């Protein structure tokens, strides 16, 4: 067996791989650690779901492994040093969900700008709803310049939004700010000026609890927050206090970690906190992009070519699941 799939690719990408390699698609084994350990022993490459941790012990059960791939972004579940030591290539579809996450953030901003959306969604037509606002003429703060922020900036500018931003890893003189037409500010300045904040900062363990009481003290009252970053960026107590005292009028976050707002948490049952189960990146289009990226990189790793070109057929996914796909050929070098 060349490739073990513990997470499915789209059918077209799977068929393309099967024409070139021995592929075993067994997503049902992902919940059985014993089955996974047994299956990876003979695999040269594996596609893993988010929930499977790659540790040194995991790699001990995969002596032939040359590549491991994931359809999602993030390396906190992978021991990268151990992979480097064993010459295992780590493949991630890092840009596949950029546009889908940017669209989620834009949609979340538009929803929260219409105050009372929570009452309206549950059918309360007589709720005491404050007047909403429009994005046009407002100031949006981009917290983090991850690739999603680049696409979001291009979406917001035609709507008449003034963009300000902050990223602890990007100097205020970096050309990217000018290129995106985003005014770089210090964190206190951004929070003081922005009417709403979009959080898409790349997460690292050193940023755990980065958005704390000291940071949120700079929020002007009534700010709206949306985000697709890891919820570990937030200090739960500080966020709860800001949601309760009005510094943050409403907050919508995608993909919060387990326990973030569960019973016993200060965020539990706050009516102005909206959590969605990682739906920002969960689109047909992003799944298609991720599947083809992973398929191409796996083939590249297992069948390296010296100057040859491989004809690859990609099948764009339309919005109608029953429609006959169009076939578009392109070259991978």
Regions found by a protein language model. Give the residues of each.
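Phosphate-binding beta-alpha-beta segment of Rossmann-like dinucleotide-binding domains, i.e.
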Residues: 86-143, 151-159, 309-310
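Phosphate-coordination loops involved in phosphoryl transfer and adenosine-cofactor binding
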Residues: 65, 136-139, 222
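Short, Asp-centered acidic motifs that coordinate Mg2+ and/or phosphate
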Residues: 44-45, 67, 196, 224, ...
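Hydrophobic/small residue at the entry helix of a nucleotide-binding pocket
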Residues: 148
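Rossmann-like adenosine-cofactor binding region
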Residues: 54-56, 170-266, 282
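Conserved acidic E/D residue at the C-terminus of a beta-strand in Rossmann-like folds
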Residues: 167
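An N-terminal-biased, well-structured beta-alpha scaffold segment characteristic
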Residues: 1-91, 192, 212-214, 218
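Rossmann-like dinucleotide-binding domain for NAD(H)/NADP(H)
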Residues: 104, 222, 228-333
């Amino acid at each position: 067996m060349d490739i073990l799939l513990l997470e499915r690719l789209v059918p077209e990408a799977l068929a393309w791989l099967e024409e070139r390699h021995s592929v075993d698609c067994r997503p049902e084994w992902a919940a059985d650690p014993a089955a996974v350990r047994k299956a990876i022993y003979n695999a040269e490459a594996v596609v893993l779901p988010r929930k499977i941790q790659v540790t040194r012990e995991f790699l001990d059960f995969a002596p032939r492994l040359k590549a491991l791939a994931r359809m999602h972004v993030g390396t906190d579940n992978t021991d990268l040093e151990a992979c480097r030591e064993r010459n295992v290539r780590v493949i991630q579809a890092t840009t596949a969900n950029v546009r889908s996450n940017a669209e989620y953030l834009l949609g979340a901003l538009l929803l929260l700008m219409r105050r009372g959306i929570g009452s309206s969604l549950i059918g309360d037509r007589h709720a005491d709803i404050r007047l909403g606002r429009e994005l046009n003429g407002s100031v949006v703060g981009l917290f983090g310049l991850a690739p999603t922020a680049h696409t979001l900036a291009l979406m917001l500018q035609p709507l008449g939004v003034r963009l300000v931003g902050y990223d602890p890893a990007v100097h205020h003189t970096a050309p990217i700010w000018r290129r995106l037409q985003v005014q770089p500010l210090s964190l206190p300045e951004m929070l003081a000026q922005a009417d709403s904040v979009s959080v898409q900062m790349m997460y690292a363990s050193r940023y755990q609890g980065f958005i704390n009481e000291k940071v949120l003290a700079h929020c002007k009252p009534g700010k709206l927050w949306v985000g697709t970053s890891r919820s570990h960026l937030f200090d739960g107590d500080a966020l709860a206090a800001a949601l309760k005292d009005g510094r943050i009028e409403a907050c919508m976050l995608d993909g919060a970690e387990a326990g973030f707002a569960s019973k016993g948490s200060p965020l539990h049952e706050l009516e102005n906190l909206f959590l969605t189960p990682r739906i920002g990146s969960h689109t047909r289009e992003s799944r298609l992009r991720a599947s083809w990226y992973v398929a191409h990189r796996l083939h590249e790793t297992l069948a390296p070519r010296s100057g040859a070109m491989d004809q690859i057929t990609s099948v764009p996914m339309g919005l109608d699941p029953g429609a006959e796909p169009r076939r578009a050929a392109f070259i991978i070098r």
